[in-house]
Amino acid sequence: MAFLASGPYLTHQQKVLRLYKRALRHLESWCVQRDKYRYFACLMRARFEEHKNEKDMAKATQLLKEAEEEFWYRQHPQPYIFPDSPGGTSYERYDCYKVPEWCLDDWHPSEKAMYPDYFAKREQWKKLRRESWEREVKQLQEETPPGGPLTEALPPARKEGDLPPLWWYIVTRPRERPM
């Protein structure tokens, strides 16, 4: 089980949140009628909220252990897994058919002429990437602590007024929005 591998490195709060989410997902598999599911989800939420402000960490850890054992005995034998999730029927199914972007550079000009708008826009993006790459790398280095990231949180996607980085979908999270 993948979620147990990172267990020692998670905070107590993260463990509780992940247990709660797993329990809700398995409850969804047990209760197919939405109203019945909602009723039992509210009961489960009340059980979690009952011990939300527990100050004694020994007791909180014991409660978490008991809750994980209860989850183990009550989990659904065949839980619903979303098709594109790991373990789902379509997980990474079409990744083998995705062609890397650099392959488009090798297209013959007659092939590129069939899609003039796309390739004109693509050339603009390539030019923008060449012009802004150094600035984007500098921004990423400025926002990352010297010893590397200390948490899983990544730097924001961009600063106010900057163009969106071209690598945002790989290494960043969305920029914070004030509440």
UniProtKB/Swiss-Prot annotation:
Coiled-coil zones: none
Pfam families: Complex1_LYR
GO molecular function: NADH dehydrogenase (ubiquinone) activity
GO cellular component assignments: mitochondrial inner membrane; mitochondrion; respiratory chain complex I
Keyword list, A-Z: Acetylation, Disease variant, Electron transport, Membrane, Mitochondrion, Mitochondrion inner membrane, Phosphoprotein, Primary mitochondrial disease, Respiratory chain, Transport
Disease entry from the Swiss-Prot or TrEMBL record: Mitochondrial complex I deficiency, nuclear type 24: A form of mitochondrial complex I deficiency, the most common biochemical signature of mitochondrial disorders, a group of highly heterogeneous conditions characterized by defective oxidative phosphorylation, which collectively affects 1 in 5-10000 live births. Clinical disorders have variable severity, ranging from lethal neonatal disease to adult-onset neurodegenerative disorders.
Family membership: Belongs to the complex I LYR family.
PANTHER family the UniProt entry points to: NADH DEHYDROGENASE [UBIQUINONE] 1 BETA SUBCOMPLEX SUBUNIT 9 (PTHR12868:SF1), NADH-UBIQUINONE OXIDOREDUCTASE B22 SUBUNIT (PTHR12868)
UniProt name for this protein: NADH dehydrogenase [ubiquinone] 1 beta subcomplex subunit 9
Underlying gene: NDUFB9
